Amino acid sequence: MVFEEFISTELKKEKKAFTEEFKEEKEINDNSNLKNDLLKEELQEKARIAELESRILKLELEKKELERENLQLMKENEILRRELDRMRVPPLIVGTVVDKVGERKVVVKSSTGPSFLVNVSHFVNPDDLAPGKRVCLNQQTLTVVDVLPENKDYRAKAMEVDERPNVRYEDIGGLEKQMQEIREVVELPLKHPELFEKVGIEPPKGILLYGPPGTGKTLLAKAVATETNATFIRVVGSELVKKFIGEGASLVKDIFKLAKEKAPSIIFIDEIDAIAAKRTDALTGGDREVQRTLMQLLAEMDGFDARGDVKIIGATNRPDILDPAILRPGRFDRIIEVPAPDEKGRLEILKIHTRKMNLAEDVNLEEIAKMTEGCVGAELKAICTEAGMNAIRELRDYVTMDDFRKAVEKIMEKKKVKVKEPAHLDVLYR
């Protein structure tokens, strides 16, 4: 009996212990599941927060982009509004001041024909109003509201050389004497004017270069443009020959006006014989217009108004047909002959044109200089180019003496017309 009670008691204890252990395990499992659920919910919450942050960032970027577009559209709208306002403003009448009457009144000749006595706006400085000035007039009251700049021919502005030619004095051979004279007349007065002041003389104003075609007249002018800091204006004589009356003379006047404004400056007139030929009695309408242009050129070169630091270089291969008026001192103070080079000059020119060429050892420049008697600088350059073409034709990267012989033979065959020697200076002044 006692044993059975003992067994029953032990079983109850074990059952109770098992029940408690089961409860503990169940609580642990419940806690673990709860933690897992909480962790899962936390991860889901973080994912939602990250997604919302990404959407917020995207919306902020879109907002900034829209703000930029809005700002750009506002700017364009403002520009268009201003343009519309300008288009609504009535046009102004252009007139020319004829006379000044009092402080705030001027006589103006309008572009439509009649002249008016008009008032001057307080926004315009009366000192800027002088006879000949172009002004803007209000369409209704004809009040002077603005002063226009001087009218200039765009063709004169286009003749100004912005980029300097890549030619220096060392690139010219056989013309040492001519280079010395041109530097004395052009460079020295511009760079060292005090030397002439000390001696008490006025520097020469102009140079005329004459000689056969291809002797280097234009090349000398290019070297002057490179070596000086002066404004260089290049004009071809035929550009001054115009169709309508007074157009050529007006262009000459504008060229010299531009040169004076940009002083120190150099005006180079190439092929000057196109407008400076001798004047004759037998004239057509075109000849008369050329003579008007010539007379304007003569007046600008040595007229009533001082020319200032403006130097003139003329070039021609027909000095015998030039008008004596343009050759007198005061217009062209020095008349420099640029002849065909002698043997020494031809050798120097050949050295200049072959210094970048890949020459064979058998090339003898002295012999080539002897073979090319009567050739000018342009023909010597053509010989060097032709010799290089002969080497390329033979698939070689160097030039031999035989290439030069063939080139000389080819160029000399083309030289059929002998260049006439220029007339003597005494004949020019008669």
UniProtKB/Swiss-Prot annotation:
Changing K157G: 4% of wild-type unfolding activity. Optimum temperature is 80 degrees Celsius for ATPase activity. It is found in: Cytoplasm. ATPase activity is inhibited by EDTA, N-ethylmaleimide (NEM) and p-chloromercuriphenyl-sulfonic acid (PCMS) in vitro. GO terms for biological process: proteasomal protein catabolic process; proteasome-mediated ubiquitin-dependent protein catabolic process; protein unfolding. SMART domains: AAA (SM00382). Residues 9-89 form a coiled coil. Keywords: ATP-binding, Chaperone, Coiled coil, Cytoplasm, Nucleotide-binding, Proteasome. This is Proteasome-activating nucleotidase. The lineage of its organism: Archaea, Methanobacteriati, Methanobacteriota, Methanomada group, Methanococci. It comes from the Archaea. Transmembrane segments: none annotated. ATP binds at G214, T215, G216, K217, T218, L219, H353. Optimum pH is 7-8 for ATPase activity. Is more active at pH 8 to 10 than at pH 5.5. Its main location: cytoplasm. Belongs to the AAA ATPase family. Signal peptide: none annotated. SUPFAM superfamilies: P-loop containing nucleoside triphosphate hydrolases.
